[in-house]
Amino acid sequence: MVMSELRWHTASPEDNKNSLKRDLLKSTPTSAREAAVHIMQNRYISRLSRSPSPLQSNASDCDDNNSSVGTSSDRCRSPLSPALSLSHQQAKRQLMSLQPHPAHHHHNPHHLNHLNHHQYKQEEDYDDANGGALNLTSDNSRHSTQSPSNSVKSATASPVPVISVPSPVPPMISPVLAPSGCGSTTPNSMAAAAAAAAAVASTMGSGISPLLALPGMSSPQAQLAAAGLGMNNPLLTGSLSPQDFAQFHQLLQQRQVALTQQFNSYMELLRSGSLGLAQDDPALTAQVAAAQFLMQSQLQALSQASQQLQALQKQQQRQVDEPLQLNHKMTQQPRSSTPHSIRSPIAIRSPASSPQQLHHHHHHPLQITPPSSAASLKLSGMLTPSTPTSGTQMSQGTTTPQPKTVASAAAARAAGEPSPEETTDLEELEQFAKTFKQRRIKLGFTQGDVGLAMGKLYGNDFSQTTISRFEALNLSFKNMCKLKPLLQKWLDDADRTIQATGGVFDPAALQATVSTPEIIGRRRKKRTSIETTIRGALEKAFLANQKPTSEEITQLADRLSMEKEVVRVWFCNRRQKEKRINPSLDSPTGADDDESSYMMH
C-alpha cells in the first residue's frame, strides 16, 4: 500500500489511474466501494466545476455517444443537482468501468463466478449507500429528444410501490418519493425535493398534450394532439369528432384514478413502516409532504386539461350550431311575416281614443292614424272588400260568431254570398259614423243610451265602449259593417219620432214603438254582485274553457241559478282581465273588443 501511494504521487495521471484500478481489485469489497465513491466524488466535483452552464450547453451534447460518460452527464445535469446525483444506470456503468475483464486475469470457472458475485455485491452496496440511486437530472434535458408517446409508455411501466404516476412529468416523482435507507433528512433529499418542485412548475403550462398520447385515435387531429400539441393549436380548432372528445375524457379519468390509487398505496407503505421509516421519523414527514405536493400538482394539471378540453368542445359545438340557427331564422322569417299580416286587424283609430282602447291595440302600430281625409284615402287602398281582415267580433244575441278566415271568405265569394265588406264602401262608412254622432248629440242621447236602446229594440246589447269606438272609427272594418245597419235603423226610428211630434223630439213617441218603453232615458244597468261560491265555480269553469259556447253558457247558468246574460258578460270581462294580466296570451284576432264591460263584484 505504501508503494502504491508513492507511485500515485510520482507517476503520471494515467499511470496513477491504472494503479488505482489494480489496488481496487486487490482490496476488500468495503474498501473498493469507498475508493470508488471517493474517485467518483473527485472526478465529478472537478468536472462540475469545469462544466459550462446548462443554459449555454447544447441539447445535442446530451446525445453524443462518442463523448465520455462523465462529460455527457455533467452537461445535462440540473443546476440544483449535487455532485453525487447519479442515476442507477450511470452508477452501474461507472462501477463496471473500474472493473477489469475477468477473462484477462482468471481462468478458473469457480473463481470467475466468485468474481461476478463479488461485482454484483459491490453494485448492490453502492445502491444502498446512495439511497436508491437518486436521479436529480433535469427532466427537460432527459426528455429533450424523447417523444411524448415514449414518455407515457415509460410512465405506465413503472412499478406500484414507488410513486411513478402516469402524468405529464412521469420520471419526476420517483426520485423524490424513493425510500431512502438513512434515518434523517439529508441535503441531497432536500435538493431533490427542490428540483422536483421546479420541474412541476416548469411543466404546469404544458397543458394536456402529454396526457393525450392515445395510440388508437380515430382522426389525424387527435393523433396530433396525442403527439403533444397544445389545445390552442389552430389545427385542433373545430376538427375533433365527438368520439375523440369521449376518448380524451376517458383518458383523463383513467389517469386520475390511477394517480389516486398509486398515491394511496404509497401512503399505506409509508404508514405501515414497510420502507423502514418509523412513525416519528422526520424523513417520513418529508416523504409524505413531497407526495402530497406532487399529488396536488398532478391533480391540478388533470383538472386544467379537462377544462381546456371542455372549452374546446363547447367552442366547436357553437361553431356548428351558429350556421344552423341562422338558417333556421332565415327560413322562419318569411313564414311568420305572412300570417302576421293576415291576422293583424286593420282599423282606423283617432287620437281621442281612451287609454284602455290603446292598450288593446298597442301591438298594431299601423292602426293609430288621425281621422283625416288623407288618412282615409290611404286606408281606402288597404281596406278593400277583398282584404282578408279579422278584428273584434260582436255578440249577436246569445251566439258567439267565430271570425271568418281567408279560406271561408273565399268559399263564400265562390258560392255567390255577398259579405258585408263587399256591399259597404269605406268612405260611405266614415260618412255614416260622422253623421250618426252629430244626430245622436242633436237628439240628446248618450252613447250608453243608444247601446241599451238597441239591446231592447233589436235584441242586441251593445256597450257604451262599442258605440264610442264606432264613432271614432276604432273598430275593425268587418265589425263596423255589421254594426252600421243596426245604427241606421235606430236613426230612422228616431227621425220618424221627430216627424210625428212636429219637429220636437218627444221620447214618449219613441217609447210607443218600443215593446219595453221604460228603457228609453234609463242609464246603465246596475252593477251585478256575484257571491264568492258562485265566483269560485265560474273561475273553475274559466280555467277549463275560456271561451265556452252558447250551449255551455246556458248549462252553466242553469246549474248556478243565474241569468245566461250575466254568465256571458262575466266570461267576457274575465277574458279582458286575463289579457291585462298576461298580454302575451292576447288572441291575435282581437275577437273580444266589443264585449260588454259590465262590472262584477
UniProtKB/Swiss-Prot annotation:
Residues 421-495 form the POU-specific domain. The keyword Nucleus applies. Residues 1-25 have a biased composition (Basic and acidic residues). The keyword Transcription applies. Initial expression in cellular blastoderm stage, then in ectodermal stripes during germband extension. Broad expression in the neuroectoderm followed by limitation to discrete subsets of CNS cells, and expression in specific PNS neurons and support cells. Residues 523-582 bind DNA. Residues 591-601 have a biased composition (Acidic residues). InterPro entries: HD, Homeobox_CS, Homeodomain-like_sf, Lambda_DNA-bd_dom_sf, POU, POU_dom, POU_domain_TF. GO terms for biological process: appendage morphogenesis; dendrite morphogenesis; negative regulation of antibacterial peptide biosynthetic process; regulation of neural precursor cell proliferation; regulation of neurogenesis; regulation of transcription by RNA polymerase II. It holds the Pfam family Homeodomain. Residues 49-68, 384-415 have a biased composition (Low complexity). SUPFAM superfamilies: Homeodomain-like (SSF46689), lambda repressor-like DNA-binding domains (SSF47413). Residues 1-32, 49-94, 121-158, 351-425, 581-601 are annotated as: Disordered. Residues 135-157 have a biased composition (Polar residues). One of its GO terms (cellular component) is nucleus. Coiled coil: none annotated. GO terms for molecular function: DNA-binding transcription activator activity, RNA polymerase II-specific; DNA-binding transcription factor activity, RNA polymerase II-specific; RNA polymerase II cis-regulatory region sequence-specific DNA binding; transcription cis-regulatory region binding. It is found in: Nucleus. Keywords: Developmental protein, DNA-binding, Homeobox, Nucleus, Transcription, Transcription regulation. DNA-binding regulatory protein implicated in early development. Involved in neuronal cell fate decision. Repressed directly or indirectly by the BX-C homeotic proteins. Belongs to the POU transcription factor family. Class-2 subfamily. This is Protein nubbin. It comes from Drosophila melanogaster (Fruit fly).
